[in-house]
Amino acid sequence: QFFMEEAFFDDCGSYVNNQPIDYHIQAIEDTEIIYFYLDDLKAIAEKSSVIERIGIKIAADFLNNHREHVTILMKFSPEERYKYLLTNKPELVQRISVTHLAQFLDISRETLSRMRARLAEQNIL
């Protein structure tokens, strides 16, 4: 997944299970990272219902984005996936390298390049 400015990232499973995440996070642009220790975060949430609600909202947003990505991969052809991003997340298409975009769409870089060329010829881009 990709996260833009002022976005929060979390791993609900690691939070709930009190275990480290089992993948890595890579910043592809200059990034400022603020992290919280789990015990500190739980203590703050217990003292503030506002913080607790913010945490729930962050988790819900993350789960919705993940669900959307999985649904797109399962339901759409590679071209439909790319068109979906063009329509619904144009900032990703504009800012992310072809290599990262292809990985996100679960297609090869070459396939994405050919698809983009074909769509450009059809004036769809």
Feature roles, as predicted:
Residues Q1, Q26, I34, I56, ...:
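Residues that recognize and position ribonucleotide moieties
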Residues Q1-Q26:
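Cyclic nucleotide-binding regulatory domains
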Residues F3-M4, I28, F36-Y37, E46:
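A conserved hydrophobic position in a structured secondary element of the catalytic/binding core
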Residues A7-F8, D40, T111:
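Short, well-ordered alpha-helical scaffold segment located
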Residues F9, I34, K42:
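Nucleotide phosphate-binding site architecture
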Residues D11-C12, A43-I44, L85, M115:
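Residues that scaffold the ATP/ADP-binding catalytic core of kinase and kinase-like folds
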Residues I21, D39-S77, R81:
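A small-molecule sensor/coupling module
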Residues F76-L125:
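Phosphate-/nucleic-acid-contacting segments
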